[in-house]
Amino acid sequence: MAVSARPARAPRGSDKVKKDKAAQTSGPRQGSRMGKLLGFEWTDVSSWERLVTLLNRPTDPAGLAVFRFLFGLMMVLDIPQERGLSSLDRRYLDGLEVCRFPLLDALQPLPLDWMYLIYTIMFLGALGMMLGLCYRISCVLFLLPYWYVFLLDKTSWNNHSYLYGLLAFQLTFVDAHHYWSVDGLLRARKRNAHVPLWNYAVLRGQIFIVYFIAGIKKLDADWVEGYSMEYLSRHWLFSPFKLVLSEEMTSLLVVHWCGLLLDLSAGFLLFFDASRPIGFVFVSYFHCMNSQLFSIGMFPYVMLASSPLFCSPEWPRKLVAHCPKKLQELLPLRTAPQPSTSCMYKRSRARGSQKPGLRHKLSTAFTLLYLLEQLFLPYSHFLTQGYNNWTNGLYGYSWDMMVHSRSHQHVKITYRDGRTGELGYLNPGVFTQSRRWKDHADMLKQYATCLSRLLPKYNVTEPQIYFDIWVSINDRFQQRIFDPRVDIVQAAWSPFQRTPWLQPLLMDLSPWRTKLQEIKSSLDNHTEVVFIADFPGLHLENFVSEDLGNTSIQLLQGEVTVELVAEQKNQTLQEGEKMQLPAGEYHKVYTVSSSPSCYMYIYVNTTEVALEQDLAYLQELKEKVENGSETGPLPPELQPLLEGEVKGGPEPTPLVQTFLRRQQRLQEIERRRNAPFHERLVRFLLRKLFIFRRSFLMTCISLRNLAFGRPSLEQLAQEVTYANLRPFEPAGEPSPVNTDSSNPNPPEPDSHPVHSEF
């Protein structure tokens, strides 16, 4: 009887809600200035109970459901691509000797077939989230594997991958399946039911924080002065701006200053009704540009999908109302939402106001605590000082997007046998699948610990590991980031204490960047320069390649002593002095001043210059023959210039072969550049089709292995070969080079010295 009585009261509540729909779902009834501007009155937040009532106000679920669908779709597309399902066998091949970088050392990947199962669960969770099918379960099925894979590899961390995990976490708790969902079709109580306002507030707050904190981080002096993304203005997307601005001013005004202003203002522009159309234009243009400028996967499209969250929640119904009637039958409902137990409704004066329950209070507390935590985390680096390097914290949760750009000039890994004292050198990055360990003390410690476990297999006992890593950040001098005299295996490191073997960034030398740019611009096209800064008491050992026939070193600041190893000669340089360095030999540069030294290498690759001259001569000769100005016969070894390589014909010289390969490359680039849009679209779709095809086939193979056991190695090899086929590519289309950073067979340690060469 009690169960049957409940539905009997529902229609009366439903009728009341429909009558007061405008008042309950669109904000305050009174058209006060604050109500029109913010959507609520000051009295709505004047007490805890009123705040609970506000955040649990019934709201149209339509806009939330559209975001749920689009976000789920983006994750379905993201898993085979940026999450790495298509290349999972290269990263987690069973028996692969590789150093990994999880957040916690206890986190380790499962066997390969089980990793495919984890990814399958994540994919099905994203699909269920998109469709609103078993919604809560689907969100959990996506969320748990996603964070497991995310925490498994710090080298792949970035801001947008972190954001995906946060959005999925929020969607797990909100009622995004109350509209346009399979759950709504199966359960009448969920179909087209109100959602509380906090569902929108927490998502809007998250997106607002992403924009605004990113803008605050861009107030960094390097960004404001235009050093962070200095070379971005060379991209063709900025060509319209360069019609009226120089490349330098385009970089400063458009890339840096406009990027700063957009991030600071985007959240506000989207929040207020009057400015929202302007915000939509700028934000959409910004993310469309980013999709072409950077390889950041689904991030621009996720941010585009999040923008309508700031619109009136019923915007999808208004859009459906403008569609043809026949099409409306296939689209989401237009009818008014039904009541939901998740919301608090205003009642008549006689009955009094609805009292907030425990559920409503907990949801309000969750919203406030979550947003406060998100405001705190980007500035929590004073707690996790072990992750602070030249930039604060692990790259990923600080929203300091694109603020810091790095270049690495020199990386040397030295090992010492703890028993014999024998020295040796390792190829930088051996036993790894990433290069990001170079900039982070925590990853360097993990790498050194891993090497100390692996090197005994190569007859190196009790190994000591030393790293000499030179980095330039935002066009500063190349300088050491870690102390090369410290054995990192035994070095102390804690996530909550400052890393003692981290070298400071020489901020006092930042004003030199203007002078360095002037020096670069004064050099001709064939002359290169590298700017170095080093600490007192340290030295740089370097090797000048035989190709660099004209190399010199010039001191800019401090005092150094240059040792020519082969000649056993030393020469001390004062500020402004320079000396020639012999090619094909080692030298050492000692900083003997009490302050850091600054110097530069100036060099010309004479071999490359000679090659360019020879290739230019062959190009000129080919053009003369083709236009008839060259009447004499070509020597047999130069005939391929006109006819290409012919089987059975004369063997072209290495120079001619190089010329022909370059011509072929240039022709291919020109062909692709001038290809019609439909051809480029087909090529793009075929690449994506291969990624999804390989992901599907490799997943099927692994799930079969788990269910029925692994077949013979011969059969597995045939199946993987079939998965690697590109059957849909047009004939003659070259397969793209595998740019996957993972290497299933990393090289063994090299016992020969490895030094940087210019």
From Swiss-Prot:
The record's Pfam families line, in alphabetical order, gives: HTTM, VKGC_lumenal_dom
Q: Where are the transmembrane segments?
A: 61-81, 114-134, 137-157, 293-313, 364-384
Q: Which cysteines are joined by disulfide bonds?
A: C99-C450
Q: Does the keyword Lyase apply?
A: yes
PTM note says: The N-terminus is blocked.
Q: Point out residues bearing the modification N-acetylalanine.
A: A2
Lumenal face of the membrane: 82-113, 158-292, 385-758
What are this entry's molecular-function GO terms?
A: gamma-glutamyl carboxylase activity; vitamin binding
Q: Which SMART domains match?
A: HTTM
Cite the EC number.
Answer: 4.1.1.90
Residue ranges, annotated region (Disordered): 1-34, 727-758
Identify the GO cellular component terms for this protein: endoplasmic reticulum membrane
Keyword annotations: Acetylation, Disulfide bond, Endoplasmic reticulum, Lyase, Membrane, Transmembrane, Transmembrane helix
* Location within or outside the cell: Endoplasmic reticulum membrane
Q: What is its main location?
A: endoplasmic reticulum
Query: Function of this protein?
Result: Mediates the vitamin K-dependent carboxylation of glutamate residues to calcium-binding gamma-carboxyglutamate (Gla) residues with the concomitant conversion of the reduced hydroquinone form of vitamin K to vitamin K epoxide. Catalyzes gamma-carboxylation of various proteins, such as blood coagulation factors (F2, F7, F9 and F10), osteocalcin (BGLAP) or matrix Gla protein (MGP).
Q: What is this protein called?
A: Vitamin K-dependent gamma-carboxylase
Q: Which organism is it from?
A: Bos taurus (Bovine)
Q: Which gene encodes it?
A: GGCX
